[in-house]
Design a protein with these regions (language model features):
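Secretory targeting signatures
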Residues: 1-37, 175
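Extracellular/periplasmic catalytic domains that process cell-envelope and extracellular macromolecules
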Residues: 44-46, 93-96, 104-109, 163-168, ...
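Extracytoplasmic/secreted proteins, especially bacterial periplasmic and envelope-associated proteins
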Residues: 45-52, 64-84, 147-154, 169, ...
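A non-catalytic alpha/beta surface segment that caps or lines the substrate-entry region
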Residues: 49-107, 278-290
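Structural recognition of the beta-strand scaffold that forms the well-ordered cores
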Residues: 49-52, 85-87, 100-103, 112-116, ...
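Glycine/charged-rich beta-loop-alpha catalytic/anionic-binding loops adjacent to active sites
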Residues: 111-113, 121-138
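Acidic/histidine-rich catalytic neighborhood of metal-dependent amide-processing enzymes
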Residues: 136-257
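Acidic, glycine-rich loop-and-strand cores that form catalytic or ligand-binding grooves
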Residues: 244-288
Length: 290
């Protein structure tokens, strides 16, 4: 469990430093951040968020459990100090869906940085019947996507504790109905984030969107022994992993290209240059981790 907390903490540290430091190259040239941003994000606090949010519930859309957990998100944000917007919407499959959105005002009120994670959950029957939902499912969605919700709450709290006014206005969005409801559904997923996008006021520029979905992994990652999971499925994880010894994966048949390695090296170098050398973040924050 400690390694899981460590992975969450490392991901969150990279996320917060990347987002704060890379939004405007003008900021990079004209204003240096302090060597250490105090307070720092807490991996332990993020893990507590995850455990408290999950609470043994199955958060499928249009259920009491879903409504209870989104109310919990709202209450947590209000305790932190945010004014919270409830974005209600309906679809063919959902009569009572709701996004929860918190705002951190910036110097530019019409230029937004949006960070999102979905609070709903779904599960399907295992292969070969993928896409079939079943009434006895009680998945808690701890990975998909309570990890995103937990870390987004931690980021929102850290930004308040930081005590500065960011250049951009920040929106922390907790989306409902992102998950596809299965092969019997009359519509696809992504409804919550779509509702948010369709209601962005005219004249507002969304400068950046970052999505936290299934956020945080331990290493090494062992591919599951499922007939539908080939080694190619893990290319994305490997592409940006911190490991230097790739033999675990190459010995298991995953083809790694020089382009993949070069991209990871290039990204690492850019992070070090911008976040550590120019903005002064601790070097341990600046790692390509996932």
């Amino acid at each position: 469990m400690g390694r899981a907390v460590g992975a969450l903490a490392a991901c969150l540290l990279l996320l917060s430093s990347t987002m704060i430091g890379s939004l405007s190259m003008n900021d990079v040239k004209t204003k240096a951040m302090p060597e250490e941003m105090d307070p720092k994000p807490s991996g332990a606090r993020a893990y507590d968020n995850l455990a408290n949010f999950v609470d043994g519930s199955y958060r499928q859309i249009d259920t009491d459990a879903n409504k209870d957990r989104r109310a919990w998100i709202k209450s947590e944000l209000e305790l932190i100090g945010y004014e919270v917007e409830e974005q209600s919407f309906t679809t063919e499959e959902c009569s009572d869906c709701m996004n929860i959105v918190a705002t951190l005002p910036g110097k530019m009120e019409d230029s937004w940085v949006v960070i999102g994670a979905h609070h709903d959950a779904i599960c399907y029957s295992p292969p070969p019947l993928i896409g079939q939902t079943y009434p006895t499912c009680r998945s808690q969605g701890a990975y998909d996507d309570a990890t995103g919700v937990a870390n987004l709450l931690e980021l929102a709290e850290t930004m308040i504790e930081w005590g500065h006014t960011p250049e951009h206005t920040w929106k922390f969005g907790f989306w409902d109905y992102e998950e596809w409801q299965g092969s019997s559904s009359s519509e696809g997923g992504g409804k919550g984030s779509l509702h948010f996008v369709e209601n962005v006021p005219e004249g507002v520029d969304v400068a950046t969107y970052i999505n936290l979905d299934m956020f945080g992994l331990n290493w090494p990652l062992t591919p599951p022994n499922l007939p539908t999971c080939s080694e190619d499925y893990f290319t994305l994880y490997l592409f940006a992993s911190p490991i230097e010894d790739w033999s675990y994966y190459t010995e298991r048949g995953l083809e790694l290209t020089d382009d993949m390695r070069e991209d990871a090296v290039r990204l690492q170098a850019q992070l070090v240059e911008i976040l550590h050398e120019q903005l002064g973040y601790p070097v341990e924050w600046v790692r390509v981790i996932d």
